Amino acid sequence: MARFDYSNQVTGKDIARGRVNEAPISPKHAIEIAGFIRGMKLDDAAAYLEGVVALQKPIPFKRFNRNVPHRKGLVGWDAGRYPQKASRVYLRLLNNVRKNAEYNGLEGDQLRIVHVSANRGIRRRSFMPRAMGRATPKDRQTVNIELVVREQEA
């Protein structure tokens, strides 16, 4: 069996980590969300992603932005989307990291995201039913996400 390790070796007693393996979400959406929440406070990132799930706040698409329309409310960028499914996975991960931090004795309101990465996972083979009893093969993409937070001094 393969062993997983974090790509960024952040060490110290003031960090907490979390990881999601093989999440069935779009890799492009996961990469854009990772680039957006990197460097944010944990509570601010969670509040913003809840707004994305409610279709109130868009995520700016800076890399995968071909044929992506403009969104009202984006500052410093014009193209954006509302990746709800990926945002729900990130919210679960942020909640997991917050609980890991509390278990390690860190304060939840002073946590800042220092590392987040989204990498393509394995492809799961599936089949899409077609007419006349045929089936078309289709690959389902997965994503591996890792997140590290550090307690910041007030």
Curated annotation (Swiss-Prot):
Gene3D superfamilies: Ribosomal protein L22/L17 (3.90.470.10)
Keywords per UniProt: Ribonucleoprotein, Ribosomal protein, RNA-binding, rRNA-binding
Organism domain of life: Archaea
GO MF annotation list: rRNA binding; structural constituent of ribosome
The keyword Transport is assigned to this record: no
CDD domains in alphabetical order: Ribosomal_L22
Entry GO CC: cytosolic large ribosomal subunit
InterPro entries referenced in this protein's UniProt entry, alphabetically: Ribosomal_uL22, Ribosomal_uL22_CS, Ribosomal_uL22_euk/arc, Ribosomal_uL22_sf
GO terms, biological process: cytoplasmic translation
Cross-referenced PANTHER family: 60S RIBOSOMAL PROTEIN L17 (PTHR11593:SF10)
Task performed by this protein: This protein binds specifically to 23S rRNA. It makes multiple contacts with different domains of the 23S rRNA in the assembled 50S subunit and ribosome.
Subunit-structure text: Part of the 50S ribosomal subunit.
Family: Belongs to the universal ribosomal protein uL22 family.
Cited HAMAP family: Ribosomal_uL22_A
Annotated protein name in UniProt: Large ribosomal subunit protein uL22
Protein species of origin: Methanospirillum hungatei JF-1 (strain ATCC 27890 / DSM 864 / NBRC 100397 / JF-1)
Gene designation per UniProt: rpl22
